[in-house]
């Protein structure tokens, strides 16, 4: 097949994952690929000339982020325009600490999600303060535990994926993934969560049990004007906003904002939330397995461990029905014949030739892109553009010769 990623460029995909063994050039490849897509317009009949810039978001899912280093620009947990490509390319680095802090502290302390203090009746302030302090301490312990919880990196990344499923404001998302083990756990998450939800919801009495637990927690927060009663109906009344004609000014907001009302959960709400999550999981899983929307680009080097891990990755992707027909082989020692012989270069070329032959045999129906080893670091948009050129044009040492990706000083 064509030894380039040109077909990928014109496939009108929504998600592209770039992954492989650690240290093989995944970040450089994903950044170059994002730059290539961002500089390639897409068809749009409503735009002047029939085309417009493609809106690309590059997301690092690796706990050890390198996007900032690759672009010579600091990125955070929110999309930030890439300098020089502000109209078409943004990047972000998912931070599990931000995810666990926001998810836990908003629900386990006495503050609202917008950060303002809860408004309570004066007579209940002391009691509420005592219980709020207790729950704040519990929240701090849980937050610290969540930060070190196995799989939290994958869960935080998956939370970002869910967010962009619901609000897809970009034409393409490119994921610079963690090394193979992390990535496989991430890709398995929809299937795992679906199975877990099915097992949990099949347990008789689970929803009423959660409802009872929420009432117990609410009652332990103190008697704040009867926000939670003994039945689901009283709980629903506490969480519902009273009508203006039947409530005194400020009374309704106090009840609605009370700790009890935040902890009251009905069995129907449990089932509704579980159903909503399952539907979202199914949507993500459907996108993962749709070759017209999602593709995976494997990155490797021509060495035994990398080739072995790439084959394992390809087999796992097939198990999850995730499309993968592109492999980028980095760091190849490719020299023009006019160059003087080099003992070290010849030794490396001999090793690489053996594994390139295996790659060609294993992946004859893949787009195998062979990228040269460069003497300079690929950093910054200009260097990434030069590197990206050979993702859509096969590199030839005789034709292209020595490649300078960095501008001379």
UniProtKB/Swiss-Prot annotation:
Q: Which GO terms describe its biological process?
A: tail-anchored membrane protein insertion into ER membrane
Supply one GO molecular-function term. metal ion binding
Q: Which residues form the active site?
A: 62
Q: Quick check: keyword Lyase in the entry?
A: no
Q: Which residues does Zn(2+) bind?
A: 342, 345
This entry carries the following GO cellular component terms, namely: GET complex
Stated family: Belongs to the arsA ATPase family.
- Subunit structure, per the record? Homodimer.
Q: What is this protein called?
A: ATPase ASNA1 homolog
Which species is listed as the source?
Leishmania infantum
């Amino acid at each position: 097949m064509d030894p380039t990623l040109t077909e990928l460029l014109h496939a009108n995909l929504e998600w592209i994952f770039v992954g492989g063994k650690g240290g093989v050039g995944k970040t450089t490849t994903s950044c170059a690929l994002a730059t290539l897509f961002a500089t390639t317009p897409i068809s749009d009949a409503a735009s002047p000339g029939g085309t417009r810039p493609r809106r690309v978001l590059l997301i690092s899912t690796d706990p050890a982020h390198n996007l900032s280093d690759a672009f010579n620009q600091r990125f955070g947990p929110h999309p930030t325009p890439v300098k020089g490509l502000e109209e078409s390319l943004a990047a972000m680095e998912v931070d599990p600490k931000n995810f666990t802090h926001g998810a836990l502290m908003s629900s386990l302390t006495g503050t609202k999600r917008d950060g303002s203090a809860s408004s309570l009746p004066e007579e209940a302030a002391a009691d509420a303060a005592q219980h709020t302090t207790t729950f704040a301490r519990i929240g701090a312990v849980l937050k610290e535990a969540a930060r070190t919880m196995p799989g939290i990196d994958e869960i935080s990344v998956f939370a970002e994926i869910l967010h962009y499923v619901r609000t897809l404001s970009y034409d393409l998302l490119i994921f610079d993934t963690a090394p193979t083990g992390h990535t496989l756990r991430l890709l398995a998450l929809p299937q795992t969560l679906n199975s877990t939800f099915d097992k949990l919801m099949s347990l008789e009495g689970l929803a009423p049990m959660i409802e009872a637990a929420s009432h117990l927690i609410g009652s332990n927060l103190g008697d704040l004007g009867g926000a939670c009663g003994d039945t689901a109906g009283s709980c629903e009344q506490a969480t519902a906003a009273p009508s203006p004609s039947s409530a005194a000014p400020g009374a309704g907001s106090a009840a609605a904002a009370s700790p009890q009302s935040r902890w009251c959960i009905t069995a129907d709400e449990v089932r509704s939330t579980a159903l909503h999550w399952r539907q979202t999981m199914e949507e993500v899983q459907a996108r993962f397995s749709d070759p017209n929307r999602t593709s995976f680009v494997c990155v490797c080097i021509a060495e035994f461990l990398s080739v072995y891990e790439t084959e394992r990755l390809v087999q796992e992707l097939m198990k999850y029905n995730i499309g993968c027909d592109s492999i980028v082989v980095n760091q190849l020692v490719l020299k023009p014949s006019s160059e003087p012989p080099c003992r070290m270069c010849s030794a490396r070329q001999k090793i690489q030739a053996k594994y390139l032959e295996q790659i060609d045999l294993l992946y004859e129906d893949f787009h195998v892109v062979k990228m040269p080893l460069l003497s300079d670091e690929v950093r910054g948009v200009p260097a990434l553009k030069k590197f990206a050129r050979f993702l859509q044009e096969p590199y030839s040492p005789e034709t292209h010769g020595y490649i300078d990706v960095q501008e001379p000083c």
